[in-house]
Amino acid sequence: MSDLAHQRRQRLIGIALMCGAVALFACLDTTAKYLNTRMDSLEIAWARYTAAFVLTLIVSNPLTHKGLLRTKRLTLQITRSVLLAASSVLNFVALRWLQLDEALSIIFTFPFIVAIAAGPLLGEWIGWRRWAAICCGFGGVLLITRPGFGGMHPAAFLSLAATICYGFYAVITRIVSRVDSNQISLFYANFIGALVMLPVIPFVWTTPDNWLIALMLMGTGILGSAGHFLLIAGHRIAPASVLSPFVYTQLIWVVILGYLVFDNVPNRWTMAGATMVIGSGLYLLYRERKLGKATTSEGVVEGPLE
């Protein structure tokens, strides 16, 4: 097999892994939205991180892989983990009232937050073309939410807050990836996420009604962990610039699942706004690729909020 054919094959496998990852994340959001009718959103988020942490212990076993606990940027690891946990909680709470496609369309603006924050935090300043794309993208968010016009539920602002938290999490992840591996970052994200929510769990705990609900609750951690595993695996064999556009295929899955599970159909405002957001995000990727700033690194894995 020629080098070119091998590279093409690796990229196709990477794309398949990315599409599989976002499909699992769509299933996670669907499960969380369903469980929201049975229990508190904090309990769902805590179960998601606790189950993922247990899986990390089983797969990685820090007793035999002691490097898993050794981070050179402990403060930043804690900060990014708290931001990720906060984004998950806010997203799950928002899903109590929003349709899956509505919440995801807002979350798709996280690359804009990254682009804005990367200037002061990473020294990666953006030009007027990308500023225009960001403004267009946030215009799409206004079209989706329609504030002041009796549009979407105010919970949309929780999705926006979740997106901001996730954007700063992604920027800090870029910083720690220079010295820590993905495995270390994933371990701390799951551990800190479960730990920070633990004190409030006794006050919001609801025992699952039956074994199916209990399995779904544990399944949130499995879906999240499996999705991140596919995400990391895809970035190891294909450039981020090739994989990133396929993040947006998650919208296809949430529209299908939203209809099948909740009988939700996207309205024209959501679809029009989502088109603006996705188009602006793809243009940002195009500009970064053209300017040579889109890099492939095992330590930099950015994907959907989960």
Indicate residue ranges for each PLM-predicted region:
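Membrane-interface helix-cap regions at the ends of transmembrane helices
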Residues: D3-A5, F53-K72, F138-G151, G193-I213, ...
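Transmembrane alpha-helices of multi-pass small-molecule transport proteins
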Residues: R38-A86, C165-F168, Y188-V204
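Helix-helix packing/entry segments at the starts of transmembrane helices
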Residues: L104-T109, V176-I192, H228-Y259
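C-terminal transmembrane-helix exit sites in multi-pass transporters
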Residues: N91-V93, P111-A132, I252-M271
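Hydrophobic/small/kink-forming positions within alpha-helical transmembrane segments
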Residues: V22-C27, L57, S81-V89, P111-I116, ...
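Hydrophobic transmembrane alpha-helices of multi-pass small-molecule transport proteins
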Residues: R129-T145, W269-E288
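Loop-to-transmembrane-helix transition segments
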Residues: I13-C19, S60, H65-L90, P154-A162, ...
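Transmembrane alpha-helical segments that form core, pore/gating elements
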Residues: K33, S41, T56, F149-D209, ...
